[in-house]
Amino acid sequence: LPCGHSKEELEEKGIQVIASNLDTAVADVPAVSGAMTMPVINKEYQYVVDLGGNDVGTLVLGRIKPLLDHAEADFFMVVNAYRPNTSTPEGIIEQMENLEYAAGLKVTGFINNTNLVRETTAECLLHGDEVLKEVTKRTGVPVKYVSYVKDVMTEEIPEGLSGELFPMEFNMRKTWM
C-alpha cells in the first residue's frame, strides 16, 4: 500500500486493494497475491497496476503478463522530470529501456507527472513537456497524459501541452508529506 494509506481508507473511496497479505516490512522476499490476476481475467475491470518504480514491481507484472491481451493493454511510464534518473531525455530513455527489458513489454506512452508536490507550478508542467517532447522525438513513444493536482495548481494550466490533461486530487496524502 502507498505510504501512510490504509486499505480501509482506499476501500471507502471505492478502490479495491489487491496486495500481499504478508508483512512486507519484515518479509525477506517480495510476495505477490494470487488475487492480482483477477482484474486481468475479468474484462469488466478497469484497473491500474502500480509497479512502484523499481525492479520489485516487475514481479507483479511477471505474474499477470501471460494473461494480458497485449492489443488492449497500455504500458505507460510515469515520468517526473525533477527526479534524478528521469531529469534528461537520456535518463528517461535509459529508464524506459530498463523497464521494457525487465517487463518484456514495450512502453506505449508516457505520463508527464513532473511535479514538486505542493510547490508544483505551470512551469513544472512545461519543463516536463519540453523534456518529454525530446524523448518522443527520439523514441516515437507519445505523451498520453499530463497529470497534476487540481488544488495545488493555482495557475492556469498551460495550453499546448503534449497529452490529455489528467487532473487529480490528494485523497490521503498528509499535509506534512
Outline where the language-model segments fall.
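N-terminal phosphate/diphosphate-binding loop that engages ATP/GTP or pyrophosphate donors
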Residues: 1-28, 32-35
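Conserved beta-strand segments of alpha/beta enzyme cores
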Residues: 16-18, 142, 164
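A short acidic, often aromatic-flanked loop/helix-cap motif at beta-alpha or helix-coil junctions
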Residues: 24-27, 118-119, 151-154, 171-176
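Short, basic/aromatic-enriched C-terminal tail that caps enzymatic domains
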Residues: 160-177
